[in-house]
Amino acid sequence: MCIRDSSVVKLDKKKADSKVKRWNMISESAAKQSKRSIIPEIMPVCTFNEALEMSQQLDVKLLPYECADGMAKTKKIIENLKGNESIGIFIGPEGGYDLDELSKAKEEGWEEITLGKRILRTETAGMMLMSVLMYMNEK
């Protein structure tokens, strides 16, 4: 979760830490229940620039964006995944990305993808994309 000046939700450090801890417990529990060998990790609350810095070591960086090119590009990117890469997913804020953020993310190797015609809630977009990635890369 990235804190931005335009963020609607304002979290203090204590609340943010407790939310991340809770989300990671949910992620671990869900992974065990579904017999996943890899547990998705929820990173600490940070600024947008800190998130870009943390993402430098990732193999694949996916940035769902409502104005991204059509499904063909997204499908190709997902189909070309080998299944053993480290993948980062950058879910946008309630109000969307601003152009400066998009530009910085692209400079750092993030690929804009689309999740379709509908604009999903922040809470569901990540789960939707994780589900698609798991389905497409099931071995």
Per-range role (PLM):
Residues 11, 72-75, 122-126:
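Short, charged, surface-exposed secondary-structure boundary motifs
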Residues 4-62:
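RNA substrate-binding interface of SAM-dependent RNA methyltransferases
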Residues 51-56, 74-82:
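Short amphipathic alpha-helix with an adjacent loop that forms part of the alpha/beta core around
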Residues 84-104:
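A C-terminal functional module that forms or caps the active site or interfaces directly
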Residues 45, 64-66, 115:
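Generic beta-sheet signal
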Residues 67-69, 94-95, 117-120:
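Short, acidic/turn-prone active-site loops that include or flank metal/cofactor-
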Residues 99-139:
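Structured adenosyl-cofactor binding patch, chiefly the S-adenosyl-L-methionine
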Residues 60-64, 68-75:
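Reductase modules of NAD(P)H-dependent flavoproteins
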